[in-house]
UniProtKB/Swiss-Prot annotation:
This is TNF receptor-associated factor family protein DDB_G0277243. Gene3D superfamilies: Apoptosis, Tumor Necrosis Factor Receptor Associated Protein 2, Chain A, Zinc/RING finger domain, C3HC4 (zinc finger). Pfam families: MATH_2, zf-TRAF. The keyword Zinc applies.
Length: 423
């Protein structure tokens, strides 16, 4: 739809009471109407919202009477004037051409909408009006036509970009592309075989030449066994009957295939062995799974007061060495009454970072009641990471089995990620 202002489609011009004192246009001059208001200062001087915005940006006063106006919210809304404006009659904007001459709308007397409605009815009318200009629904990029909505059927009958079915193969094709489709793509159009001169559909022709045409020259099927003959397909049976050495050619082919199968089997078996070995290596260099059993737990609980730890044996993941530190009576006074447990990376301080995902699982005689916590951490030096309050000491007796405490340890070193940049 062409751009327009409401004062361009009025049946009768408005008197000055409805106009802005600065731009002289109606204060309500565009849709949607609910976004516009008739606003005046306390002395009744009326401006449109756009002009009020510009005026208050320059000076906080009415440009006519100079009364102070700090913001739009201080202005008065003239609802009586708005109601009168909404009752004014206008022509439907779809009653005009979709272009202007000398910045003026041109009435379309033959094909345009003839409706005359109130300004208040305008928006609802436009939602249903069949005279609105639309773009081609087939291909608005290639088809530049614009037409009224009620003329869609007429346009579709002549549009070169409508999709139609090929009369031969029934495939959907854009009308403008139909000659190219018939020339190059249609599978039903009959084409002549260059060898036997019979006619076939394009799709059938390819199969005919590859597998059926009697005049196509082909290799002997025993070429792989040593037969170098090339004959027309129609003479193939005769060739195979007359040549008594084809059994020897077949034996050569069979033997060659047997050797290839044996070699393939050997390679597959080796790949399976190599794969299993690589799986083991990857597991060793990136992950450790095991358990740490602490015997005589009750004695340990007595002999290791708060802030003193038990230290597990070292275990390695690739070149990294780790150990677990366990505080039976808690790490420092804050965590007294709890068992604390930490994973330590044992290496000299380094600028590189080792990212580790790990878990500790305290085993219960009933596996469904085992206690497990997991965590991730970035290590740059020999500092522990873990759980200061892993379990309340009062509850730990439920996990003692034959005087032993067993902890499952699962530690995985996450490979570092890197960004590659080319300048």
């Amino acid at each position: 739809m062409i751009d327009y202002k409401i004062n361009e489609i009025l049946v009768k011009q408005l008197n000055d009471d409805y106009n802005c004192s600065i731009c002289v246009d109606p204060v309500l001059n565009s849709l949607p109407l609910e976004q516009h208001q008739a606003l005046s200062c306390k002395n009744g001087h009326l401006l449109c919202q756009a002009c009020w915005g510009k005026q208050l940006a320059l000076r906080k006063e009415c440009c006519i009477c100079k009364i102070k106006v700090e913001s739009i919210s201080e202005l008065c809304r003239n609802i009586f004037l708005e109601k009168g404006f909404r009752n004014k009659k206008v022509h439907c904007p779809n009653g005009f051409e979709n272009f202007k001459v000398d910045e003026k709308l041109i009435k379309d007397e033959s094909d345009g909408c003839k409706s005359v409605i109130t300004i208040d009815q305008l928006e609802s009318h436009l939602r249903e009006c069949e005279f609105v200009f639309i773009e081609c629904p087939n291909d608005p990029i290639r088809c530049k036509d614009k037409f009224r909505k009620n003329q869609t059927d007429k346009h579709m009958n002549k549009c070169q970009y409508v999709t139609i079915n090929c009369e031969h193969c029934k495939e959907p094709v854009i009308k403008n592309d139909m000659p190219t489709h018939i020339e190059n793509d249609c599978s039903i159009i009959s084409l002549e075989c260059e060898f036997c001169k019979d006619k076939f559909g394009r799709r059938s022709l390819e199969n005919h030449i590859a597998n059926e045409c009697p005049n196509v020259v082909i290799d002997c099927p025993h070429k792989e066994g040593g037969c170098t003959a090339r004959i027309k397909r129609c003479y193939l049976s005769q060739h195979l009957t007359e040549e008594d050495n084809h059994i020897r050619y077949m034996q050569k082919i069979i033997e060659k295939h047997r050797i290839q199968v044996e070699e393939s089997d050997r390679i597959i078996k080796k790949l399976r062995v190599d794969y299993k070995e690589l799986e083991k290596r990857v597991e060793i260099t990136s992950r450790y799974k095991g358990n740490w059993t602490i015997e005589n737990w009750s004695q340990k609980l007595t002999h290791y007061p708060n802030n003193e730890r038990l230290k597990s044996p070292y275990f390695c993941i690739g070149s990294k060495s780790f150990y677990v530190g366990l505080y039976p009576n808690g790490f420092n006074q804050t965590n007294a009454g709890f068992m604390s447990i930490f994973l330590h990376l044992y290496e000299k301080p380094s600028t590189s970072t080792t990212v580790v995902r790990f878990s500790f699982e305290l085993l219960h005689s009933d596996p469904t009641k085992s206690l497990k916590f997991e965590k991730s951490n970035k290590y740059t030096e020999n500092k522990g990471s873990g759980f200061s309050q892993f379990i309340d000491i009062k509850m730990i007796n439920n996990f003692i089995i034959d005087g032993k405490l067993t902890i499952n340890i699962d530690v995985e070193v996450i490979p570092p990620s890197s960004s590659l940049v080319t300048k």
